[in-house]
Amino acid sequence: MALRGWRLFGVAGTILVYVGGILFLSFVSLQGPQQKRGVHGPRGYGEFETIRNRDLGLMGKKPPLQWCTELHYLDAPIRTPRKPPKLLQTFPGHFVKKFNSKPELAALVSFPGSGNTWLRYLLQQATGILTGSVYKDYGLLKSGFPAESVANSSVLVVKTHEWGPHAWAPYTKAILLIRDPERAILAEFNRQSGGHVGFASPDRYRRTKGRYWTQFVKNKLWAWEQTNLSWAKNFTGEVKLVFYDDLVENVEGTLRSILKFLNYQTDEELLACALMRKEGIYRRKKRILQFDPYSPAMHAAIDEKRAEVYAALGRYDAH
């Protein structure tokens, strides 16, 4: 009887130990995540959100934009204030009067990679008016710029990267957005390789033993010069120069000056909202490369061309 009692006691003890072990493991597993949430709190959630947004980006989706007001086309074209007619000399000894008779159409001009899309975003936030483009970028069309390919006076400004008489013809005035060529060329290379907010992989710079990148820099530096000088010097309408660095440093002041140039009365409430949401999703985040993609010869060529163009535009304090 005594032996049998000890056996029953042993079995009961084993069962108790087994059940106790299960309960202990369950308690630990439940406590683990709770402690992690308690220690990290919002940070842990933020990391999850970052991963989720990044994954959506890989799938070609962007987080939804929040506009300060509903976007719309201009109800009526903005017209140039009545001014005395200008005397234009069509050939030696012959003058004609030029009247301001047509609605304004403003071009938003830049070399690619200079922040054109970001400035369009800021203008749409600050006015609620759609901006147009001579292009039809389906990515932009679906994510905040429904007036892609609209190039008439129903929009606030029209994006273009073109230059020359045919490109100037439709416009009465132009906003010329200028960015340092070294950064603009790099941004354009990233755009062609990774989209509006993506990046080129390091191996892209080494493609064809670097010859592709070398030729890209040479071609784009020439295009950067032509875009900026042709509009600044040869376009016959009014031109407002906007340097990208000034826009970054003083978003409010730059937006105010642009709206004044466009003869558009500033809405203080919308402007304040635009400044709160100034980053948006169309500005490429900074990324530090582990190498300098520009060779010494490239740097020298860029420095020389930058100095020439900036001097022609009256900018002497850059770089």
UniProtKB/Swiss-Prot annotation:
It holds the Pfam family Sulfotransfer_1. Glycans are attached at residues 152, 228, 234. GO terms for cellular component: membrane. InterPro entries: P-loop_NTPase (IPR027417), Sialate-O-sulfotransferase (IPR051589), Sulfotransferase_dom (IPR000863). The chain crosses the membrane at residues 8-28. It is found in: Membrane. GO terms for molecular function: sulfotransferase activity. It comes from the Eukaryota. It is a single-pass membrane protein. Its main location: membrane. Disulfide bonds: none annotated. Keywords: Glycoprotein, Membrane, Transmembrane, Transmembrane helix. Belongs to the WSCD family. This is WSCD family member AGAP003962.
